């Protein structure tokens, strides 16, 4: 698992919070002080809390669990998609659709529709559709892919959710709480840590900081998968030896 250091966090600007006038008092315990009216996050707290979150992810994935990566703000989208894909985990990078988890049955129907439309599009020319019809089909598929592409291979509800910016993803937190799904989240000084099981206090606006968080969580996923694979191989060898 990648060992994120204090130096890397400083270089990525993890310690820069929001303007002091926008602060959330619930984050007081994670704030070191203020500089030029900007709150400074206490990295002495962030680093071990991030490591704890990584360890929780590793354990969960080693037990065949699924972590849903969520980050729909502009700075996070590409990074969330890239790192979740690298880790082989589902993600939401475009827009959180209301009921994405609490109404998962309906979402599954939409995913089925996406699969059917994608298959139809692949055979559209042979099936005699006009260029205009094919273009309309492409638009439909692209629209569905943007909203659901990241979760189309998800087999059921996730076992945990990793969130960038709790203020931006309030809908995600509400649904997770309703379903009892634990949340691992980056929480900046202007947001509340309520409803987050594993709080990572830090900058949620800097692309460098977002990359650092996502890479660290994705690495934890990959380590968990590797552990699960090793345990499966060891069990198979044990059975074969009997």
Swiss-Prot record:
UniProt keyword annotations, A-Z: Ribonucleoprotein, Ribosomal protein
TM segment ranges: none
Gene3D superfamilies linked: Glucose-6-phosphate isomerase like protein, domain 1, Helix hairpin bin
Keyword Lipid biosynthesis applies: no
Presence of the UniProt keyword ATP-binding in the record: no
Coiled-coil intervals, chain numbering: none
Record-level GO cellular component terms: cytosolic small ribosomal subunit
GO molecular function, one term: structural constituent of ribosome
Highest rank taxon of the organism: Bacteria
Any Gene Ontology biological process: translation
Family that this chain belongs to: Belongs to the universal ribosomal protein uS2 family.
Entry protein name: Small ribosomal subunit protein uS2
Naturally occurring in which organism (per UniProt): Neisseria gonorrhoeae (strain ATCC 700825 / FA 1090)
Gene giving rise to this polypeptide: rpsB
